[in-house]
């Protein structure tokens, strides 16, 4: 182990997803080798993220305003809502250029072993959003685009149970074709676009 601030930096970097001890050490020593202005810029960006980035009050996506740019865009179809687990999944769907509706970010997936139940996700907000007729528009279709893994499928099944009795609402699930056990963010644009286009009705 190293001493003082160097080890503190390695420890903090190691808490980031996908960063193991060796990667954390490599990044730390890279940061030690760069010029002070570069460190200042990185510090400033982290400060802006801490102070200026929040979550959209409508969909839960990351935003620097109360409403994200997608929810604020009148060209987006408010009657079509795509439900995803995390903000990174919004970006994955956006890269396909196949979806012109809006989103609802759950903030995760059901995982009882990790203590994540329906109360820890933004499911109640989704139900309220459907019932409140956002901007005077009825939500006509909810596309469930949770990850194709055990937690994502459990979340999709739960959502179908919660949504299936709402009058006039169509509930669909993105089509198979995505690798089981994978994450939406790693799917290529063509595969994910086809999964959206081939979505199937759940009720």
From Swiss-Prot:
Domain Toprim: from-to ranges: 79-179
Record's keyword annotation contains Hydrolase: no
Superkingdom of this protein's organism: Bacteria
Keyword Zinc-finger in record: yes
Keywords for this protein: DNA damage, DNA recombination, DNA repair, Metal-binding, Zinc, Zinc-finger
Start-end of C4-type zinc fingers: 56-71
GO molecular function annotation: DNA binding; zinc ion binding
Its biological purpose: May play a role in DNA repair. It seems to be involved in an RecBC-independent recombinational process of DNA repair. It may act with RecF and RecO.
Family according to the record: Belongs to the RecR family.
Listed name of the protein: Recombination protein RecR
Species this chain originates from: Mycolicibacterium smegmatis (strain ATCC 700084 / mc(2)155) (Mycobacterium smegmatis)
Gene: recR
